[in-house]
C-alpha cells in the first residue's frame, strides 16, 4: 500500500517513497512475483485459483504523483495497480493532514499556539521541529471528528502563506490513469473516519464517492478502501455492509497481513513497504510470500 511517490526525498514527509526507491521495488516485484490487477486477484481468491507469489499494488487517496511519477515506472515494468480515490479532493482539493504538513513547511519560526484546541504550544524552528509539530497535530486531531479536524487545519493554515493546490489528481488525469490501465477504486468523498459518522452519513460518503467516480470515468469502481482502514477503530461490520450495499465487489483495509483462501473479500489486508534498502525489501517480500497461501497485497 502506497500513498505518494515523490521525485526526491522530502524532509517534511520522511516516510514517503521516492521515485528511486519505487523503481527498485517495482523491478523486484516484476522479477520475483506474479503481480496482478487487484480485481483479478479478488476473482481468483473467490475461486481459489491464485498463482503462487501473487501480489497487488495499491495507492490510497488519489495523489497527483501517482500519475506523474508512479505510473510511468509501473508501465516500464508491466506492473498493474489500483488507485483508491477520495472524490471530494480531486481538482484542486487538499486533505486536512496535507494542509497541516504544508502549512508547517512555511510557517515562520517561533511558536504555534493551539491551546484553544487543547493541543498545546509547539516550537517552530528547524525542519525537525516542523515535522514533529505537524505529525503531533495530525495524530492528536485524527479522531476528533471531521468538523474539528477541519477547524484545526484551517487555523494552522491561517498562520502560513499560500498552500499548494496541485497535490491531488484532477479529473482529467484520473481519466488518463484509467485509460492507461490503472484501476480506480472508491475511497469515499471526503476521507472521513467512518466509525465516527452517523450511519446514514457514512452511507452517503461511500455511495457518493462511488457515484462521483462513475460520473468521471463512465463506470463505477469495483473495489473500495476504508479510509484509515483499521478494523473497529476506523470501520466496523456496519460499514462492511454499507460497502456491499453500494455495489462494491471487495474492499481493502490497512490491517497488516496477506490474503489467502478464506480471507473476507471485504476486509483484505495490506502492508506498506517502508524498507529503504533493496535487501530489507526483498527479505520482507520473501517472508510475506511464505505466509498463508503465498499471496500478498502491497
Task: Show which residues each predicted segment covers.
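Gly/lys/ser-thr-rich phosphate-binding loops in alpha/beta enzymes
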Residues: 57-105
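Short, catalytically relevant binding-site loops at active-site mouths
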Residues: 90, 190-192
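C-terminal active-site subregion of NodB/CE4 polysaccharide deacetylases
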Residues: 1-58, 65, 96-105, 109-114, ...
Amino acid at each position: 500500500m502506497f500513498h505518494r511517490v515523490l521525485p526526491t526525498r522530502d524532509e517534511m514527509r520522511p516516510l514517503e517513497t521516492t521515485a528511486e526507491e519505487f523503481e527498485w521495488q517495482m523491478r523486484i516485484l516484476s522479477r520475483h512475483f506474479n503481480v496482478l490487477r487487484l480485481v483479478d486477484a479478488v476473482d481468483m481468491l473467490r475461486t481459489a485459483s491464485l498463482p503462487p507469489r501473487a501480489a497487488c499494488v495499491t495507492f490510497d487517496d488519489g495523489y497527483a504523483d501517482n500519475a506523474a511519477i508512479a505510473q510511468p515506472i509501473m508501465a516500464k515494468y508491466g506492473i498493474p495497480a489500483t488507485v483508491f480515490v477520495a472524490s471530494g479532493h480531486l481538482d484542486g482539493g487538499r486533505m486536512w493532514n496535507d494542509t497541516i504538513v504544508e502549512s508547517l513547511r512555511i510557517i515562520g519560526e517561533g511558536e504555534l499556539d493551539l491551546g484553544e484546541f487543547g493541543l498545546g504550544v509547539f516550537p517552530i524552528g528547524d525542519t525537525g521541529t516542523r515535522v514533529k509539530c505537524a505529525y503531533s497535530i495530525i495524530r492528536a486531531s485524527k479522531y476528533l471528528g471531521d468538523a474539528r479536524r477541519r477547524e484545526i487545519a484551517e487555523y494552522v493554515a491561517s498562520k502560513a502563506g499560500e498552500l499548494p493546490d496541485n497535490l491531488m489528481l484532477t479529473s482529467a488525469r484520473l481519466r488518463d490513469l484509467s485509460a492507461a490501465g490503472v484501476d480506480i477504486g472508491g475511497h469515499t468523498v471526503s476521507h472521513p473516519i467512518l466509525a465516527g459518522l452517523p450511519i446514514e452519513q457514512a452511507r452517503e460518503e461511500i455511495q457518493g464517492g462511488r457515484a462521483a467516480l462513475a460520473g468521471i470515468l463512465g463506470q463505477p469502481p469495483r473495489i473500495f478502501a476504508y479510509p484509515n482502514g483499521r478494523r473497529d477503530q476506523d470501520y466496523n461490520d456496519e460499514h462492511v455492509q454499507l460497502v456491499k450495499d453500494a455495489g462494491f465487489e471487495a474492499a481493502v483495509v490497512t490491517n497488516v497481513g496477506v490474503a489467502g483462501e478464506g480471507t473476507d473479500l471485504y476486509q483484505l489486508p495490506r502492508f506498506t513497504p517502508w524498507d529503504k534498502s533493496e535487501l530489507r525489501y526483498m527479505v520482507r517480500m520473501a517472508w510475506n510470500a511464505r505466509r498463508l497461501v503465498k499471496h500478498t497485497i502491497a
